[in-house]
């Protein structure tokens, strides 16, 4: 009997910890998106894209800011994550979230479809950055903004397979992000070095 009670207590504590972690993650995403929305000057009717949306927590946080008049594309390359994203969009009955399967070198977004595009901890995973950058630029409207949120290479993290050697490990130096995206035709508008979790954010604009 004592063993069963002990197991029940452990299970309840585990569930409580998981729930607290999920709530904290949602809160963190909401706070970060609030800051990003201000930085990128989102307004009613803004069309955005979350590249490499993963589990969608930043996509769904963004929807709260974009409102019914806005729209967001959530792109993902992983098949399982794509299906989970689609299921969650259906569950939430969201009409302004479009899930898109991206490719290694292609966002698969329509041409000039977005006012704002953001990549959060995704850019350092790109194996074909030159081609992908060209796609990002193509997907932006004139005057559209691109935000790259990422971090410098960090010790203790396994290198990402297939990425260019100039990344220097798991992560990417800020100067490389700037060099590659200015070469693609974008202009740096602002650099933020105090982003949450010791990340940085580089904001570009398409002229």
What are these model-predicted stretches?
Residues 63-64, 130-145:
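A short glycine-rich, Lys/Arg-flanked "PGG" loop and its adjoining helix->strand segment in the class I
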Residues 43-46, 107-117:
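A short acidic, Gly/Pro-enriched loop at the edge of an enzyme's catalytic core
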Residues 44-54, 82, 145-176:
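Conserved class I S-adenosyl-L-methionine
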Residues 113-130:
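A short SAM/SAH-binding and catalytic strip from SAM-dependent methyltransferases
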Residues 28-46:
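Conserved alpha-helix/loop element of class I SAM-dependent methyltransferases that forms part
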Residues 189-207:
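Core SAM-dependent methyltransferase catalytic element
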């Amino acid at each position: 009997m004592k063993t069963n009670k002990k197991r029940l207590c452990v299970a309840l504590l585990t569930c409580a910890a998981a729930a607290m972690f999920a709530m904290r993650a949602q809160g963190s995403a909401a706070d970060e998106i609030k800051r990003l929305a201000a930085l990128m000057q989102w307004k009613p009717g803004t069309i955005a894209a979350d590249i490499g949306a993963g589990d969608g927590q930043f996509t769904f946080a963004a929807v709260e800011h974009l409102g019914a008049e806005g729209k967001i594309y959530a792109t993902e390359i992983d098949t399982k994550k794509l299906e989970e994203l689609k299921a969650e969009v259906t569950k939430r009955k969201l009409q302004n979230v479009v899930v898109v399967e991206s490719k290694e070198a292609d966002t698969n977004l329509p041409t000039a479809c977005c006012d704002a595009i953001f990549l959060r901890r995704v850019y350092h995973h790109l194996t074909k950055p030159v081609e992908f950058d060209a796609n990002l630029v193509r997907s932006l409207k004139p005057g559209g903004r691109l935000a790259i949120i990422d971090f410098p290479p960090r010790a203790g993290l396994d290198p990402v397979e297939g990425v260019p050697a100039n990344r220097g490990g798991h992560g990417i130096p800020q100067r490389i992000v700037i060099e590659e995206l200015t070469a693609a035709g974008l202009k740096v508008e602002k650099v933020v070095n105090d982003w949450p979790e010791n990340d940085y954010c580089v904001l570009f604009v398409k002229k």
